[in-house]
Amino acid sequence: MDSSLEQHRLEINENREHWRRKPVLRRVYAQFYRDIAARINPANPGFVVELGSGMGNVKEHIPHCITTDVFPNPWLDRVENAYGLTFGDQTVGHLILFDVWHHLRYPGEALREFSRVLVQRGRLVIFEPAMGFLGRYVFGTFHHEPLGLENDIEWTGGEDFRPDKAGYYAAQGNASRIFTGEEFKSCLRDWEIKEIKHYSGLAYLASGGFRGPQLYPTVLLPFFNSVDSLLSKFSSLSSRMLVVLDKK
């Protein structure tokens, strides 16, 4: 196994232990997953598939979702590579990417593959870091993955591109750059942006995530959610974003 993928596998196992020990983290993520589940269109035929499922938590909220990752785990349904999916043409109704988009070195290659497997008007639901003030400061200062805001985004991998050779990649700012800026609008012409929702994510950030210290008692989560609701009205403060794309 590639060393970067092995590191990712080890991180998932560590995260499972943190997940077990931090009830507030489970509750915060449940809120995010409920928002994702609310974007599932029951009129769409085809499978509901999550790519990069990690711990497979999506099944608590979308039980029929097919969970996948780039390596096998006993709690996941199958192994999939976003650049070369094993699903047939137009067999998938929804694709869910939770903290996966910023790991796609060549987003254009992935979107081409997503378009192949999605039914007409099939839906892509993406949940990502956002580059408002809180996102830039917290993720840029305390997170081990780079924001990548100053780096060029390589839309495609070129004529010799192979799905299994993309390698590890991370740039947490890519979703904000691609979906809220002007630079990549022409690259998204085959997709309709149905929704972009920003979250301040304060309850999540102050929970410490998987590795940081929890900065408030779990009993105060409703208070932090109330503050979140107010701050989330201002995308300039956001640390999280939900993007919904429909295939044209």
Per-region residue spans from a language model:
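Conserved N-terminal segment of class I S-adenosyl-L-methionine
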Residues: 1-83, 241
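Short conserved loop adjoining the S-adenosyl-L-methionine
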Residues: 84-89
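A C-terminal cap/extension of S-adenosyl-L-methionine-dependent methyltransferases
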Residues: 182-186, 194-248
